Design a protein with these regions (language model features):
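Positively charged n-region of N-terminal signal peptides that target proteins for export
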Residues: 1-4
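Domain-level marker for long, solvent-exposed, non-transmembrane regions
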Residues: 18-307
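Intrinsically disordered and other compositionally biased segments
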Residues: 6-7, 21
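Bacterial N-terminal signal peptides
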Residues: 8-15
Length: 307
């Protein structure tokens, strides 16, 4: 009874609205991220105790556990109460996962939420609109596990709207290169043209890089080669600055950069949170030249391979 009352307090404080799905419920026991649907487990790049992040597609997943309210007499009512409790816990875990996500190499999303009441209110509002993934899992002891997901772009848009968030500040609108060869409109012919690339693939294995919403690529002198100010706002808000995967071949064939990505090796990570990547000065010079003539950096067509 105390647990149900506690979950009720979560509802009153955060204002969550429960979502309900019963059809096709599972009865297999599980725990933690092991309760995530198989599709989420297959796609996630980073796992945590109560959820995971799919950094390739920009999705947060969180699981929630709920127990039935024993004061209800019917099994249907007890199942319903357990599901509602599980949904609230999943939303709370999702909020915690979002808060602890790196914003850049120095700050987290929670830092941004502390900086602005507006950011905090909007992100919590987005949490209330999250979707359940798959059907609830009913355990053998009557408890329930559910999975909720949230699109990363919803968080990025909220943060980017606030001028106080330096990680998403840009001095000017990004202009298309004069000699632009558009990877998004030129079709398959661009993938075979000499010197024309469809994206950037950075091998960051061994660098201890940590994924972030607004990372940078630096050269050995500390100059920014790629950052939020170098990307068209439409692309950065919709798909983020970079995608991250552990499988090199999966990263190479990812829709974001596939066909003919320019491949480089990162030297090491940088910053307090190890979210920035350092590349050689020679690669930096070549990328800057490409950025003047091609569109893949402006369109955030960047993938990073992790350990």
């Amino acid at each position: 009874m105390k647990k149900i009352i506690f979950f009720g307090l979560v509802v009153s404080v955060l204002g969550f609205t429960p979502l309900h799905t019963v059809v096709g419920s599972s009865h297999e026991d599980c725990a933690g991220v092991g309760c995530l649907p198989q599709e989420a487990q297959n796609q996630c790049t980073k796992n945590f105790r109560d959820g995971c992040i799919d950094w390739a597609n920009g999705v947060f997943y969180a699981v929630g556990f709920g127990v039935p309210n024993t004061k209800f007499k019917s099994a249907a009512q007890r199942n319903y109460s357990a599901q509602v409790a599980a949904e609230q816990v999943a939303m709370r875990n999702l909020l915690r996962l979002v808060e602890t996500t790196l914003l850049d190499s120095e700050t987290t999303v929670q830092d941004g939420m502390l900086e602005s009441d507006r950011i905090r209110t909007k992100i919590k509002g987005q949490i209330r609109q999250v979707q359940m993934v798959g059907a609830p899992r009913y355990m053998s002891d009557g408890s329930v596990n559910v999975t909720m997901k949230m699109q990363m772009r919803e968080v990025i848009k909220v943060l980017a709207e606030d001028p106080r968030i330096k990680a998403f500040s840009a001095p000017h609108e990004i202009q298309a290169p004069q000699a632009l060869v558009s990877t998004s409109t030129a079709g398959s012919s661009t993938s075979t043209a000499s010197g024309v690339f469809t994206g950037l693939l950075i091998d960051a294995r061994g660098t201890e890089i940590s994924p972030a919403l607004s990372p940078k690529v630096l050269n050995e002198d500390g100059d920014v080669i790629y950052g939020f100010a170098d990307v068209d706002r439409q692309f950065s808000l919709e798909q983020g600055m970079m995608g991250y995967l552990k499988d090199p071949q999966a990263a190479r064939s990812n829709e974001r950069i596939k066909d003919r990505p320019f491949e480089i090796k990162a030297l090491h990570s940088s910053g307090k949170n190890n979210a920035d990547l350092v590349i050689s000065n020679a690669d930096g010079v070549r990328l800057r030249q490409m950025n003047r003539e091609q569109s893949f950096l402006r369109e955030a067509r960047v993938m990073v391979v992790l350990d």
